[in-house]
C-alpha cells in the first residue's frame, strides 16, 4: 500500500464493463432484463459521486439479483476501513467497485456474492495510498460437493497466474472472514477473499482483480444451470428462508462492506440490495438428524475443495 502510481479511469472503465457483462448474462439466463437505476450524490452531501444499480426482483431463476457499481469519495475513511490501519484514519478517500449478491428462487441453487474494488486514501502533502480488495463466496442451502469443487477450482485458476500462494491464502482468509461467530459456523462453503492488496504494484494488482472479476460467470453460472430445474416443494422453500436468516445476520452484524457503506453515508437502497427477499427465524430449531437439511452442517466448516 505504498506505491502511489495508479490509474482510476482504467479501473472505472473495467468495473462498469464487468457490471454490464454480468447483468447481460443474468438477464439472458433468467429471461428478464435487469432494471437500471443510476444515481448521483450532490456535492454538499457527506459522500460524493455516484453509481448504477442493476436489479432484478421476482424473476424466473432469481428471486433477487443485484449488481451495484459505485464510485464515491469522502473526506474521512469510515472506521470499518481504517480499523486495521489506524495510520489512515481521517484521510480522504475514493472507493470504486462492483458488488453483487444473487438469491435464486430454487433452494437447490446457492446464493452467491462477488465483489471487486479499489480504494485510494489521500492526505494533503502526502502521496496517495491505494489498494485492491474483493473475492467471491458461495452459500448453498442444499449443498453439492461437485458445485463446491467447481467453484473453488475456478477461483484457484483465476489466482494461480499471480502466484501459487494466493489461492490458499485468500481461501483461508475467506473461511475466516465469512464466519458467524455467534453461530460457530461459516456462512457457506467459502471461496476467496482479499483486501489491502497492492504488493506487486498497480498493474499486476489490477490484473489480479480483473482475473477474479472475469472468473465470476464461469464459477457460478454452470452451477445454476445444473440446479435451477430441480424439483422442490414447501419444505425446501421453508429451509431456504431459514438459512437466509443467517445471511442477514452476517451482513448486518459482521460485513465490512455493509458497515463501510452505512458509516460513510452511502446509498442505503444499494447497500441493502444484498438482503434476501424472504427470510425467517425459528426459536431453537434443529433439523431432523439424517435429513437433507441436517447434511448442510457438514459443509459449514472449512474444507479443502481442490
Curated annotation (Swiss-Prot):
What keywords were assigned to this record? Cytoplasm, Heme biosynthesis, Metal-binding, Oxidoreductase, Porphyrin biosynthesis
Return the similarity comment.
Belongs to the aerobic coproporphyrinogen-III oxidase family.
What pathway is it annotated to?
Answer: Porphyrin-containing compound metabolism; protoporphyrin-IX biosynthesis; protoporphyrinogen-IX from coproporphyrinogen-III (O2 route): step 1/1
Name the residues annotated as catalytic in the UniProt entry: 113 (proton donor)
On assembly, the entry states:
Homodimer.
Gene Ontology terms: biological process = protoporphyrinogen IX biosynthetic process
> What are the required cofactors?
a divalent metal cation
- Name a Pfam family for this protein: Coprogen_oxidas
Q: Which reaction does it catalyse?
A: coproporphyrinogen III + O2 + 2 H(+) = protoporphyrinogen IX + 2 CO2 + 2 H2O
Q: Where does this protein reside within or beyond the cell? A: Cytoplasm
- Mind listing the GO molecular function terms for this protein? coproporphyrinogen oxidase activity; metal ion binding; protein homodimerization activity
Q: Which gene encodes it?
A: hemF
Task: Identify the stretch(es) annotated as Important for dimerization.
Answer: 247-282
- Listed name of the protein: Oxygen-dependent coproporphyrinogen-III oxidase
Q: Which annotated residues bind a divalent metal cation?
A: 103, 113, 152, 182
Predominant location: cytoplasm
| Residues reported to bind substrate | 99, 115-117, 265-267
Q: Which PANTHER family match?
A: COPROPORPHYRINOGEN III OXIDASE, MITOCHONDRIAL (PTHR10755), OXYGEN-DEPENDENT COPROPORPHYRINOGEN-III OXIDASE, MITOCHONDRIAL (PTHR10755:SF0)
User: What top-level class of enzyme does the UniProt entry assign?
Assistant: oxidoreductase
Residues the record annotates as the site (Important for dimerization) are 182
Q: What does this protein do?
A: Involved in the heme biosynthesis. Catalyzes the aerobic oxidative decarboxylation of propionate groups of rings A and B of coproporphyrinogen-III to yield the vinyl groups in protoporphyrinogen-IX.
**Enzyme Commission number(s):** 1.3.3.3
- Which species is listed as the source? Burkholderia ambifaria (strain ATCC BAA-244 / DSM 16087 / CCUG 44356 / LMG 19182 / AMMD)
GO cellular component terms listed in the entry, alphabetical order: cytoplasm
